[in-house]
């Protein structure tokens, strides 16, 4: 089924706690994850909370990647939303699983903007005239 985008919602468990609490490492990893997908990076913003935890977003031309960490639990919540046929969010997922040293994951993929539900013909390209 064709769609405008794919949204991967990932729960990373039993991660490296030091990495999860390092804002520089998380930002670098999220940017690298974006590049792994083949996306074009637009901007990013990351914040370290006190006493611990990091939240951040990488905005890409094709949508966004976000992360929220709870180092005290070894847990990270990650959203990987990409649009178009030229990027693969699963590459970002695999990269982050390795970098965060996650021992266990729960992940679902949700198709966003399904062609049949919007009324777009299956053979239409992603980019059309407005």
Curated annotation (Swiss-Prot):
Pathway assignment: Amine and polyamine biosynthesis; S-adenosylmethioninamine biosynthesis; S-adenosylmethioninamine from S-adenosyl-L-methionine: step 1/1
Transmembrane segments: none
Cofactor: pyruvate
Modified residues annotated as Pyruvic acid (Ser) in this record: 63
Residues at the site labelled Cleavage (non-hydrolytic): 62-63
Any single biological process term in GO: spermidine biosynthetic process
Catalytic activity of the protein: S-adenosyl-L-methionine + H(+) = S-adenosyl 3-(methylsulfanyl)propylamine + CO2
GO CC terms in record: cytosol
Key words, A-Z: Autocatalytic cleavage, Decarboxylase, Lyase, Polyamine biosynthesis, Pyruvate, S-adenosyl-L-methionine, Schiff base, Spermidine biosynthesis, Zymogen
UniProt-listed Enzyme Commission number(s): 4.1.1.50
Cystine pairs: none
Cofactor note: Binds 1 pyruvoyl group covalently per subunit.
PTM notes: Is synthesized initially as an inactive proenzyme. Formation of the active enzyme involves a self-maturation process in which the active site pyruvoyl group is generated from an internal serine residue via an autocatalytic post-translational modification. Two non-identical subunits are generated from the proenzyme in this reaction, and the pyruvate is formed at the N-terminus of the alpha chain, which is derived from the carboxyl end of the proenzyme.
MF annotations from Gene Ontology: adenosylmethionine decarboxylase activity
Active site feature: 63, 68, 83
HAMAP family assigned: AdoMetDC_1 (MF_00464)
NCBIfam families: SAM_DCase_Bsu
Subunit (UniProt): Heterotetramer of two alpha and two beta chains arranged as a dimer of alpha/beta heterodimers.
Function: Catalyzes the decarboxylation of S-adenosylmethionine to S-adenosylmethioninamine (dcAdoMet), the propylamine donor required for the synthesis of the polyamines spermine and spermidine from the diamine putrescine.
Family named by the database record: Belongs to the prokaryotic AdoMetDC family. Type 1 subfamily.
Protein name: S-adenosylmethionine decarboxylase proenzyme
Organism: Thermosipho melanesiensis (strain DSM 12029 / CIP 104789 / BI429)
Gene encoding the protein: speH
